[in-house]
Swiss-Prot record:
Taxonomic source organism: Chloroherpeton thalassium (strain ATCC 35110 / GB-78)
Keyword Cytoplasm included in the entry's annotation: yes
Molecular function, one GO term: DNA binding
Record's keyword annotation contains DNA-binding: yes
Protein name, as recorded: Probable transcriptional regulatory protein Ctha_1786
Length: 250
């Protein structure tokens, strides 16, 4: 899930768990395949594919798996024909939820997503019902041990930096316009500053803080959505209260 400051570290730990469960490779393969199908198999001329391949390599995906995923996308070898679909709705406590999926059976996927949402007390809405509450941005995470705030500001202002978030304990979050993400990455690489990840993110204009039962239900809902094989990304505008975080860490 893409969420915010207080529990960003928890999400990173969860991502490592997702990898152990084998979920991450499935999602990465789908993203590579779709990117190659939409923009061609040459990463030099297809920024989305280049980003997908970089993320796959960063997560230790074998080169042969990456090659086959690209070839499925370009039609060189047979494979499932994935379709991209976005769903919008509301979760516990009235939080806004955007779900991005890649599926070869949209009827199956919408039924499964609706079931997960409804059993958590949420509901699917119409297209556009909550997406207006978010902005699509380029996002890069950089460990605070590798660079200072001043260093990043100076380096990235000419490379499309829109915001530099510092409220996570261990990481800076660089936000750019989507079209400037590649420029920001290249500036960091030229300065030999390693980044944890680079991605397209949906940033909420405002967040809703959840506590108690709502926080627990929302976290379970997001976990269930992310565990679904067809779901690629889940975005919400929730923030978890300090008391709920303490309980989560017990």
């Amino acid at each position: 899930m893409s969420g915010h400051s207080k529990w960003a570290t928890i999400k990173r730990k969860k991502a490592a768990t997702d990898q152990k469960r084998g979920k991450l490779f499935t999602k990465l393969v789908k993203e590579i395949t779709i990117s190659a199908r939409m923009g061609g198999g040459d990463p030099d001329g297809n920024p989305r594919l280049r980003l997908a391949i970089e993320n796959a390599r960063a997560n230790s995906m074998p080169a042969e798996n990456i090659k086959r995923a690209v070839q499925r996308g370009t039609g060189e070898i047979d494979g499932a024909n994935y379709e991209e679909i976005s769903y919008e709705g509301y979760g516990p406590g009235g939080i806004a939820v955007i779900i991005e999926a890649a599926t070869d059976n949209r009827n199956r996927t919408v039924a499964e997503v609706r079931h997960i949402m409804s059993r958590s007390g949420g509901s699917l809405g119409e297209s556009g019902s909550v997406s207006w509450m978010f902005q699509r941005k380029g996002s890069i995470s950089i460990a605070k041990s590798l660079a200072s705030e001043e260093q990043l500001m100076e380096l990235l202002l000419e490379a499309g930096l829109e915001d530099l978030k510092t409220d996570d304990e261990d990481y800076f979050s660089v936000l750019t316009d989507v079209k400037d993400l590649e420029s920001a990455k290249k500036a960091l690489e030229a300065a030999k500053i390693a980044y944890e990840d680079a991605k397209i993110d949906m940033i909420p204009d405002n967040t809703i803080e959840l506590d108690g039962e709502d926080a627990e239900k929302a976290l379970k809902m997001v976990d269930a959505l992310e565990d679904n094989d067809d779901v690629q990304m889940v975005y919400t505008n929730m923030e978890i209260s300090e008391s709920a975080l303490e309980k989560l860490n017990q």
